[in-house]
UniProtKB/Swiss-Prot annotation:
This is ATP synthase subunit b. CDD domains: ATP-synt_Fo_b. Pfam families: ATP-synt_B. It comes from Serratia proteamaculans (strain 568). It comes from the Bacteria.
Length: 156
């Protein structure tokens, strides 16, 4: 094979071309590729962090919902207990009021009964005196009459 100056020139030109590419062309290309790889890695890491944050937020939301439900249940139970307490107090108060009204009514009935008995005794005494006056057919003075009425009332 015949090595002549052309092949030697081409070899030198090729070596210079490779050196030029390695020195001036290759570094910006590699820098752009590395920059892009870094951006992609950052994007993936950010997506992974966002996914973890979402999972954490969902877990927190679930925990808060459970806590809120438990608190709501406690509040409902307290409200039911308070309702029962109020109902019991109202029943007791109504029972006391009923007993008071019944006692008052019984006292009024007893007072009315005594008054009616007293009135009846007086009327019976008056009728007895009137009957006695008619039977005896004489007049009795007023002082003696009231004394007789009082004695009859006491006896009845």
């Amino acid at each position: 094979m015949n090595l002549n100056a052309t092949i030697l020139g081409q070899a030198i030109a090729f070596v210079l071309f490779v050196w030029f590419c390695m020195k001036y062309v290759w570094p910006p290309i590699m820098a752009a590729i590395e920059k892009r790889q870094g951006e992609i890695a950052d994007g993936l890491a950010s997506a992974e962090r966002a996914k973890k944050d979402l999972d954490l937020a969902q877990a927190n939301a679930t925990d808060q919902l459970k806590t809120a439900k438990a608190e709501a249940q406690v509040i409902i139970e307290q409200a039911n207990k308070r309702k029962a307490q109020i109902m019991d107090e109202a029943k007791a108060e109504a029972e006391q009021e009923r007993n008071k009204i019944v006692a008052q009514a019984q006292a009024e009935i007893e007072a009315e009964r005594k008054r009616a008995r007293e009135e009846l005794r007086k009327q019976v005494a008056m009728l007895a005196i009137a009957g006695a006056e008619k039977i005896i057919e004489r007049s009795v003075d007023e002082a003696a009459n009231s004394d007789i009425v009082d004695k009859l009332v006491a006896e009845l």
